[in-house]
Amino acid sequence: MMKKSYKRKKGPVQSKKITYDGIKFASGLERYMYMALKKAKIKAKYEGQTFELIPSFEFDLESIERQSNGKGEYKNRGNKKILNIKYTPDFIGKDFIIETKGRANESFPLRWKLFKRLLTEKFDPLWTLYKPQNQKECDETIKLILQKQNT
């Protein structure tokens, strides 16, 4: 009897990790953006700053549930510290932030909204946000940044 081979189910977002210039990029689109910024001589740091969207807190109530992955025993998982939620944009420059996003994962839309709220409430209107989703939009982002720098 032949044993069936099963393919492991992958999540909806499959980006390939790529190393370029000694930097490990999470996707080919991030590398493309890096190369475009470098070619245009626009200074930006890759994953240069992490922002805390929601601080950690103590959860002192009971919470009857399984583990967050849906496995494990259905029991009290409350009365513990809840970790903070952080966000690290792909590129950060003097007056811009770029988040390259081919296909958003499940948590990204919420993080992006929380990030926009944080920028609105805690920072001067210093940055312009760009979220290119393909190489054409990366090229357009470069043009827009250069136009802003020349005005």
Residue spans for each PLM region:
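Electrostatic, structured charged patches in enzyme active sites and in nucleic-acid/phosphate-binding
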Residues: 1-151
